[in-house]
Amino acid sequence: NVSGNDGIDYILNQTEKTLGNVFVMIPSCVPATSFEDNGVILYAKDMEKYLKNPRVLGLAEVMDTRSVITGEESMMKKLDLFKDKNIDGHAPLLNDYDLSAYALSGVRSDHEAYTNQYAKKEVERGMYVFIREGSAAKNLEAIVKGIVNENASTERYCFCTDDKHIEDIILEGHISYNIRKTIEMGINPIKAYKMATIQSTQCIGKGKSIGAIAPGYKADFVVLNDFEKVDINSVYFNGENVEKLLELEREIAACPEHLKQTVKVKDFNRDKLILKVKKEKFPIVNTIPGEVVTEKIVEEIPIEYNNEEKIFKANEIYNKIAVVERKNNTGKVGAGAIKGFGITNDAIAPTVAHDS
């Protein structure tokens, strides 16, 4: 979203010699929607050079669902370019008709299902469902509970985290945590391990080389002390113990200087964060605990007066949220109100240019 092809090239270079299989999907929606001010815009022609890279497996989560469903030309060119590779989805809250159109476009998977009913609809349309259990979004319990209650097949289900904080990985584990929790909820352990391994690699188009211990497969495997508790003894990559490999010195690619100088904010001042309110009932971004999806609500919000002008006043229930254009020096700032963040007398200012 900030550096375009230079950013993609940097990620590919940085992960070339890692002690693990790091594959890259090319971002499909830069910007995520037409309403955003991005550092760059990526078109299909900008993605062509990555098609022959063996570590580029396809097109990353297609989140502009409206462009897919309506057949918008630029989006169709991207989907056509990657039609012989894997195409990841990002499709929350679509109705049955739109979900069918979305699947018809060639999108192979989705990780945004947060109910068992929605996951079933995606599976019925031939899609893989990556059950997400991360730091913010936790969907595993709802989906796995439905699978267990209905004694449903797990063949089109896999695991992902979709943003899990380092401290949570250290405390809980990563995909290992998903396996453990799924077994505890009643899924057959063999099926849980298949969801984490061979079914995932089959979905991404690598099911004939990784994801199983069998002739012709890479010797990437985990040795366990306890099968059901997923208590890990050691990890092997390319047949070698990773713990021993970590002791060796390795060359790490340097970050190009121009990628370090990307935060450019023009004429920013406190006044740009003032949120003027004409009516006390105001549209608000409402957060949903345990989910990354939000909803629009209209509620009466706290106000104060500034020279007889009504302005929003944050409190323990309602916080102020702002988007500051940070790449092209446009000076654009958008302010709004958000509910459920639970911050008082503090501020957070991340520069990450995540998706929408």
What kind of feature is each model-predicted range?
Residues N1-D88, N149-A152:
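Divalent-metal coordination cores built from histidine and acidic residues
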Residues D6-I8, T33-G39, T70-S74, D98-Y102, ...:
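Short acidic, glycine/serine/threonine-rich loops at helix termini
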Residues I11, L59, E122, D162, ...:
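Divalent metal-coordination and catalytic microenvironments
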Residues G20-M25, V56-A60, K85-I87, V107-S109, ...:
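Structural motif
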Residues E61-N116, E133, A137:
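Divalent metal-binding pocket/active-site signature
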Residues D98, L104, R108-S209, L224-V230:
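Active-site-adjacent C-terminal substructures of enzyme catalytic domains
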Residues I170-G186, I190-S356:
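Active-site microenvironment of metallo-dependent hydrolases
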